[in-house]
Amino acid sequence: MFVKDVVIQLNLSVLIILVYFYCFVNNSRFIFVIYIYKFGKFNLSLLYISDRYSLENYQIDDFVDNSQNINSKTTYLNGSYSKEFPKIKLKLNTENFIFGDNQSNSFSSIVKFNFKNDNSLALKYNFYSVAPSYNTLLHSSNYENYNWDNEFDNSVTNSISLNLILSNILDLDIDLISVKKHVQFEKLIDDNSPGINNYSIIPVQYLDNLEVLKIKLARKIKFGKFSIDSKLLLQKTMSDNIINLPEIVSRNTFYYSTDMFKKALYLQTGLGVKYFSKFYMNGYDPLLSELYVQNEKEIGEFPIIDFFINAKIQQTRLYFKFEHFNSSFTGYSYYSAPNYPYRDFTFRFGLVWNFFM
């Protein structure tokens, strides 16, 4: 159920205040919003969230209720400010904990400089203090090793980003990310236990700083009717065996575009190539429905090549896609996670018919 009522609306020559009240009944969220337009756009809101995380566990023979739950009621004060100058755009966002159970806070800022010929430079800073997920705090299961009731501190993330757009040359993104008190799932092996009970997946919190550097390059090149759209991501973590990331990720599209039959048909066909370097990809635990860090099996260094045909005839669009068609001749050693093979060759097609243009 969703209710939206305009409570107050004042129109002044230099000051405009809009007050809204939002009520999300089903998930217990209440929002009170004020918009102020003076020397920029200012948004102030009051947010109340009530959550209940419950794990039901009953023992029928003994009529025992072992259910566990987490109840959270939190109030936040949110604010945002934006201002546009002739060549500069400024935007600030903040979410501040006032009182309650979930003590999360965030702040983000963006300054963007616009130059000639659609060139721009953007500087960003983000801060997040986020409570761990409920699944890391509380879990109940018939499996002995999958029961816990934890108290973790907030994970604190600071990131600095630079985005440079040089029209017709390249797009450059540089991100430096620092995470403190990071919480994740890990695989714990017990050599003294036999069979499938010799390991468990448990949540762990690291107190040290984890740092990641990411550099992303994007470039689009056009030679007549031929085009190349390339993206390259280079990333390095200073905390190996804690956060596992591929050092190289590449996505490339090579395609040919043309009009045919006196421009009655627009045709586009080409290849899409995806690749990432070998790394210890996170494993998947079906009991928790969570990914966990593993350092036993490396996955990567296999290309995924797709062949596609797109066509447009007046109001109708057609597409044919042969996904991962190289699977049969590049070796069956591709996985989306340890013990979870990536999909083989797949054919897809579709039709879009617009009745009204």
Task: List PLM regions with ranges.
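Exposed, low-structure sequence patches enriched in small/polar residues
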Residues: M1-I8, L12-M357
